Amino acid sequence: MLYTLSRSPYACDLAALLRIAQHGDDLLLLSDGVIAGLTGSPAACALGASPLTLHALENDIVARGLSAHLSPNIAIISYTDFVRLTEKQPQQMAW
């Protein structure tokens, strides 16, 4: 499953997403969802302890000036890589 988080972790039920996540699932942080990847934040710590493989969209990180503040556990990816994730994970759920 590919989960996409496009809202701030403070404006969604991140705990619910983490409860249903399984090994082999991917999570892409995009738009305001990249805030969940800030180093040392409660959201980043919770994501790091989850079974999810974590990704964040580079354009959204740069647009918010967060390049130097993203957790090292999160792979920064391009739009092309986003397309590859959708090919890898045919089932998707937006948060």
UniProtKB/Swiss-Prot annotation:
One of its GO terms (biological process) is tRNA wobble position uridine thiolation. Signal peptide: none annotated. One of its GO terms (cellular component) is sulfurtransferase complex. The keyword Transferase does not apply. Transmembrane segments: none annotated. Gene3D superfamilies: DsrEFH-like. The keyword tRNA processing applies. It comes from the Bacteria. It is found in: Cytoplasm. Keywords: Cytoplasm, tRNA processing. Heterohexamer, formed by a dimer of trimers. The hexameric TusBCD complex contains 2 copies each of TusB, TusC and TusD. The TusBCD complex interacts with TusE. Belongs to the DsrH/TusB family. Part of a sulfur-relay system required for 2-thiolation of 5-methylaminomethyl-2-thiouridine (mnm(5)s(2)U) at tRNA wobble positions. This is Protein TusB. The lineage of its organism: Bacteria, Pseudomonadati, Pseudomonadota, Gammaproteobacteria, Enterobacterales.
